[in-house]
Amino acid sequence: MRFDAIVVGSGMSGGWVAKELCERGLKVLMLERGPNIEHGPDYSHELAGRLRKRDDQVPLEERQLHYPYYEGVAYALFNSNKKFWASDHDYPYETVPGKPYRWIRGYHLGGRSLTWARQSYRWAPDDFESNLKDGHGVDWPIRYEDLEPWYDHVEAFAGVSGDYDGLPQLPDGDFLPPFPFNDVEQAAKAQIEAAFPTRHLIMGRTANLSRITKAQMDVGRQRCEQYVRCHHGCPLGSYFSSLAATLPAARATGNLTVITDAIVESVTYDAAAGRATGVRAVDRLTKQGVTYEARLVFLNASAINTAALLLNSRSDAFPRGLANGSDQVGRNLMDHVSCGPVIGTYPGFEDTPYQADRPTGLYMPRYANVTETGKPYLRGFGFQGGAARRRRPDAEPDASGAPKRAWVFSLTPFGEVLPNPDNRVTLTTSRVDSWGVPLPVIDAAHGPNEHAMMREAARDAAAMLSAAGCTDITPWEEAGAKLTPPGDRIHEMGTARMGRDPATSVFNGWGQAHEVANLFASDGAVMASSASMNPSLTYMALSARTANHAADLLEQGAL
């Protein structure tokens, strides 16, 4: 069967592309390299509820072999849900000596949309103009106004809870009611904002349903019950994922075909026609090759895999990889950067109960080089954090005989990483995986801007906790020197950027390849910069916009 469109990848962006195309009447084939996951029955949510976390840890030897990136996702990777985390042993990649990279993946239907932290922020107008203003990277070919209606579109369907905060550096959206602050957070917010009036501590905006709408009920989703076992999959569909939301909507049209265990290794290309004709894939289980054909091809395999697919799709017409006349495929790999968390003990509130059942923390939007200028670095960062109780074994026991728990407040910065063409993905010429596909080689490191930014972020965090009255605050010099390695924040992007000029970019502002008109992408690969906010909501908006534009072109006979 020949399809109207092939979508490679079933995660955050691929699910949106499939939904939009199917609802426009296109026959869509979705290819997922990993196994099928059934929404609900294949989740570990109920099992995790019966286990103590300490009894659900991946054994040390297994962790060292399969999950060496564990440190960055220790909050979410457990023995009961390890199938949602790709094994570095089974799916290897290479790095450059002295430049570690943590590539954290989810190879199964739904991808990392099952395990993401659900933080959902619109980028600001300035984020689409920063490259132009300071000369790093290339200018975005779109502006916030181009994406604004698509932010509206995806928020209404996905469901994002949050406050209307009225901050230009973090645009408001179509929100469900926010989750509440606890008493300590309310007190700390007042103290911090009084001491630093240019900074704002807000409730995190999260893709958890604090209230149900018809759009969500129509695909079988339910209101969030705040079990806080989201990383095990939610059988209620209370947080947004491909399995809970976009794929049910796509399937409801009757236009979607899903094939799992299909490892796409390259895009096929007809040089005479100047068009992509489909993809070549390898069956994960049988290792047999198969070719699928379609009028349109969408790459939504995640930034590194999308770049690897293009690089491996070489031909006489494109000896450096498909659509790579600019030599930009694989370049400008970005993530976000954090330093060590800054934590302080918050006094008082000893009799205030703590319920660890909120599916989001607090957020402080960027202020550096926005409301506070003259910084010794470009761009900026936001903070994620909140207040919780921590066990104090040295304290007097409470009435039940259990050790008292002190309130602690933590802040962790997430900083923007500048585009750098030397941070890149290539393919090894000497090693292939179990399916005969060349391994990606990742060469990336943080630069002086990221180091300077994190040093100040740690100092700022300590100053804010001090203003809130905290004691025993993490030494900021210590925290600011501990940068997360690239990849650790799980926001990889930028390997096939969109831009205005085919000489310096791979895709145009619609996610359409400059050199191959029926080839599209809308995952992290197309990002021209990284901003300071989590990128998933922007991936969703770009995907909906790209898919509808492609459908328009097909209807007009332009493809």
Q: What is each of the regions a protein language model found here?
A:
Residues 5-30:
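N-terminal Rossmann-like FAD-binding beta1-loop-alpha1 element of flavoenzymes
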Residues 7, 11-12, 183, 304, ...:
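Residue-level detector of alpha-helix initiation sites
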Residues 23, 27, 34-54, 236, ...:
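Glycine-rich loop(s) and the adjacent beta-strand/alpha-helix scaffold that form part
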Residues 39-42, 161-173, 471-482, 556-559:
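Short, glycine/acidic-rich hinge or "gate" loops at secondary-structure transitions
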Residues 82-112, 116-117, 122, 135, ...:
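FAD cofactor-binding and catalytic pocket of flavoenzymes
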Residues 202-210, 227-230, 259, 265-268, ...:
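A glycine-rich dinucleotide-binding beta-alpha-beta segment and adjacent secondary-structure elements
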